[in-house]
Amino acid sequence: MKKEDFFMKRATGFAAVLMAAAMVFTMAGCGSSKDADTSAKKETKTEDSKDKENSDKQFIVGFDAEYPPYGYKDDNGEYVGFDLDLAQEVCARNGWELVKQPIDWDSKDMELNSGSIDCIWNGFTMTGREDDYTWSKPYVDNSIVVVVKEGSGIEKKEDLAGKVVAVQADSSGLAALTDEEDNEENLKLAASFSDLQQVADYNTAFMNLEAGAVDAIVVDIGVADYQLESRTGFAMLDDKIRTEQYAVGFKLGNEELRDRVQSTLDEMVKDGTFDDIAKKWDLSDMVCLGK
């Protein structure tokens, strides 16, 4: 064999090896690129699924539709109020749809435990109920007060002896007058009434007071303030029945949803949105979250 032929064959063989190696490398590179594309698509799909899950979520808030300024129907037939505004902002920040679900207050536990609502958010007193629900942090300081007609001669709690007093069924006002634990003073007060009438809602109570069917109403101070601003001929006693706090009540054990809502409320406190909503409803002096 000639020397030139020998080197030509060696060169041709070497070139073939290089080409084969290049093809393997290229295929490997294409495979890596394909794997990377597939991984990226999976991540995008997962993120899209999460976004869709959030956007599809309904947040169903159970509330008393006759409990201003926390939740009620306005003159336009819309459900409005401080608590509903807070819930709306929480939903907006989480991509949820808010469903405002009016409930009978004395059926609230059944609604919550059956899953008909996600939470009770409407001037809901946590004081004395701490172990019955999974609670948010308290966000309003509340007082239970007494409202009477002007000129009735009732100026202090003791003047309620022998009187007919109205209170909402299954309310914190009723609990303040009937709870047996560490409540001797209020139990004595309630025993002095000629009658303690339970009504379905406070609008009914105020109509009964105006008509003279009852002598006084035991009610939350926020509701009393709202009613006294929109009605004439009523007065609020300086004496308070009890002080307490409002919070959002979730089904016992539903900590995941509670934590999501609470973290959003905390964000709203930090950026000032919570205080802005409180100012809108003249409740700045009563809110306590973040203070």
Region annotations inferred by a language model:
Residues G13-F14, M27-T44:
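Bacterial lipoprotein signal-peptidase II cleavage site
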Residues K45, K50-G123, D271, K280:
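Extracytoplasmic small-molecule ligand-binding "clamshell" domains
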Residues A65, D141-V148, I221, D225-S263, ...:
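Periplasmic-binding protein-like
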Residues A65-P68, Y79-E89, F124, V145-A200, ...:
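Bilobed "Venus flytrap"/periplasmic-binding protein-like clamshell domains
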Residues L84-R93, I154, E158-D159, K163-S172, ...:
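Extended ligand-binding regions for polar small-molecule ligands
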Residues Q88, A92, E97-D159, T232, ...:
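Acidic, polar ligand-binding/catalytic clefts
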